[in-house]
Amino acid sequence: MASVLEKVLRVGEGRTLRKLQNYAKAVNQLEEDFTHLTDEELKNETVELRERHANGESLDDLLPEAFAAVREASRRTLGLRHFDVQIMGGAALHLGNIAEMKTGEGKTLVATLPAYLNAIASRGVHVITVNDYLASYQSELMGRVFRALGMTTGVILAGQTPQQRREQYAADITYGTNNEFGFDYLRDNMAWQASDMVQRGHFFAVVDEVDSILIDEARTPLIISGPSAGDANRWFTEFANVAKRLVPEVDYEVDEKKRTVGVLETGIEKVEDHLGIDNLYESANTPLISFLNNSIKAKALFKKDKDYVVMNGEVLIVDEHTGRILMGRRYNEGIHQAIEAKEGVAVKAENQTLATVTLQNYFRLYKKLSGMTGTAETEAAEFMSTYKLGVVPIPTNRPMQRKDQSDLIYKNEKAKFEQVVEDIAERHAAGQPVLVGTTSVEKSEYLSKLLAKKGVRHEVLNAKNHAREAAIVAQAGHLGSVTVATNMAGRGTDIMLGGNAEFLAVAAMNARGLSPVETPEQYETEWDDVFAQVKAEVDEEAAKVIEAGGLYVLGTERHESRRIDNQLRGRSGRQGDPGESRFYLSLTDDLMRLFNNGAAASLMGRDSVPDDVAIESKVVSRAIRSAQGQVEARNAEIRKNVLKYDDVLNRQREAIYGDRRHILEGDDLQERSQRFLEAVIDDVLDSHIGEGNGDDWDFDALWTELKTLYPISITIDEVITEAGSKGRVNRDFVRREILSDAKLAYSKREEQLGEAAMRELERRVVLSVIDRRWREHLYEMDYLKDGIGLRAMAQRDPLVEYQREGFALFQQMMGAIREETVGFLFNLEVEVQAPADAESVGPRIQAKGLAANQATADKLRYTAPTDDGGVEVRNQRGQIEKAATAKAQKDQQAEDAVLVGEDEPETPQGPPARGAFGQPTGASSAPQNREERRKADRRK
């Protein structure tokens, strides 16, 4: 199906390119006019364009003039003029497409075109990059273009305070990473004051390296979490010791391809003997099964120095695609704790999910979305089906001259690396720069030792020295340089022959203590001279590099994804430069070993083929392409499945977040509370009386429950007397009497506290209850999804079952929210205090057991996806924000809060009575909790 869709998508490419070429022609016709404008006149173009847009002209109509203005501003500030193909790429982005542009075609510069045009609407434009460094670098460099046009730029970085973030989002164009934008969206929907929210909507986004962000990282959601009750850490340590004693193929079996393990009967017996239990699979022991499976996975599937490294007593994940250490990232589902126990380091506690969204659903919030990458063609069908984004291949500015050599395959890894070293040494001696791509930290260090032994000077870029990453990449095009890198996906820094002049110039300016933000005038004054000097030196060296053959890219192993291989190759041959690429493979490489059908091994097994002799075979090439296709199809199916299930939760999230936003924006909480009161009384009546009359009802039980809900003032006898007799009391009559009494009690409560204090109490209670119940609902939905796959064994569609039961859980949650809200509003002990000062808005109230504001910031954890199945976890302080800063932020929140709360747990503690607010309020007592549903599942 995908192949048919891809063919259909390609049919309209010619028509689209002609449309883009017409835009480029229109911009070219205006170029001369704009060159004659003064700097002030150029800046005033923005004012004029905004006025025209406000008067009804569409952004499409303004495109030629806006693009011409950006081209001229870039020429004046950066000395870079947009090529026609870059104009075409910018137009493709503005029209809501993915522009497929080869490496080195200037994607960063292209993004300025649609960013400026859409910023004319004054609704904010987001430019999404792959890391904080690039966000800061691009906002600094491209900010010079936007400032020349009278527009402001911002950058969102980890560690910024809410006030700093709000200021950055207020800019016309804001740069940042997908994780930061996504977390701000979640935090905004956890805010307790409208003034605490930082984003101002989702109008238009340009996503750089769009395939990496929207495809590779789409499987795992963004999660904000906080500490959870209980401590299971001792079990991780216990089972790590158990796993050490289990023997592969005797006690358990492993499927490396599917990344699964299975415990055999002998293994189960050993575990039961070790723990002193009779049956591991008894209901009381079922929680232990996940500890066992995770411990075996940690032992068998996760390898030290390949999948992770241990540094300073911590287990740090290594990104399989980029080779970077993913600081703070953690595998989910208990895998990371199992690895920590395996390595004998401190096991960190698990957290409870407070808010979550997948990147797929976050980016679908934008009114218009676009993206750039050099390798989107292989995923065109998925981009269209998931994001409604077309892929438009943009022609290169100059013809590609890179020579892509055929793969060389060796019998074993030792022979392969020996030939790799020989090839590198020869090219290094000739002055040709070499970029070597490896698939793991272990392989890069192994190759580094071989090169050192050979006497070849080189730089190593991997997870253990990523702090120098950008500087190393920028120098990788120098004469005779050799750079060993653990995969090059998402590096984001151009490798230019002779060196990256822009990067080197910015570094030189920073060395002088100059910043475009802090010293803008001096920065602009000195930039031209510094850049000209650096550019001259780079150009002179580039000529020598071209003579030596350009950049040579050498891959030491094929990756599971063709896109990653293409990204590595694409580092060479930018902008028509000469270059060359080749992959060296062996039959023991992971991809060949896991997916090889045996044809290659049969071919290489002949005695006539020595170890140090390579073969070039179409059979092997086909086997590799087939293996990569299998992996890509499997990953695409996983992403598709994740989206289907998350769409269920997404609709619920939109309802809850919409409710919260209305509350923060001044929704009539008195009217909402009255609706809640009516609904709760209806629920109580439904549970105690039927359709008959008073002769059949248990009035005592009904009144007992009503007393726990609100201070009921009417008696049973009064209701019966009013009706005339017990038999004449029907449901409508008793409902009317009770509701009238409840509303009277509510009015008395408001009179007692005062109108302003009552409104504030309503806001506090509703937000607190919604947030807590939503957290518990996320917990329940997560558990439901974990086991829903088993329904297939009963010939039921797991997705349909998940939708049905998820809706039922949502309805239960909404009922619990109404019930708890009413109970708290009537029963909380509230002390009303006078305003702190003349500037305070309304009275201050103190409600015992009710949170003063949202979850304590310094206890939150931020979890982000990685394309290898791991997750990134940062605390509020992180590596960038210091503890003092986090404390200052927390103090500021407490100071700014309208309410003052006691230093108690944020979970509201309700009156000791009935229902959701009277019983223990943890997940263990929530309707359809885990243990109850386990029993229900076993019955099914």
UniProtKB/Swiss-Prot annotation:
Its main location: membrane. It is found in: Cell membrane; Cytoplasm. This is Protein translocase subunit SecA. ATP binds at residues 86, 104-108, 494. Residues 929-940 have a biased composition (Basic and acidic residues). Transmembrane segments: none annotated. It is a peripheral membrane protein. One of its GO terms (biological process) is protein transport by the Sec complex. The keyword Membrane applies. Part of the Sec protein translocase complex. Interacts with the SecYEG preprotein conducting channel. Has a central role in coupling the hydrolysis of ATP to the transfer of proteins into and across the cell membrane, serving as an ATP-driven molecular motor driving the stepwise translocation of polypeptide chains across the membrane. One of its GO terms (cellular component) is plasma membrane. It catalyses: ATP + H2O + cellular proteinSide 1 = ADP + phosphate + cellular proteinSide 2. Gene3D superfamilies: Helical scaffold and wing domains of SecA (1.10.3060.10), P-loop containing nucleotide triphosphate hydrolases (3.40.50.300), SecA, preprotein cross-linking domain (3.90.1440.10). Keywords: ATP-binding, Cell membrane, Cytoplasm, Membrane, Nucleotide-binding, Protein transport, Translocase, Translocation, Transport. It comes from Clavibacter sepedonicus. Residues 884-940 are annotated as: Disordered. GO terms for molecular function: ATP binding; protein-exporting ATPase activity. It comes from the Bacteria. Belongs to the SecA family. The keyword Transport applies. Monomer and homodimer. Part of the essential Sec protein translocation apparatus which comprises SecA, SecYEG and auxiliary proteins SecDF. Other proteins may also be involved. Its EC number is 7.4.2.8. It holds the Pfam family P-loop_SecA.
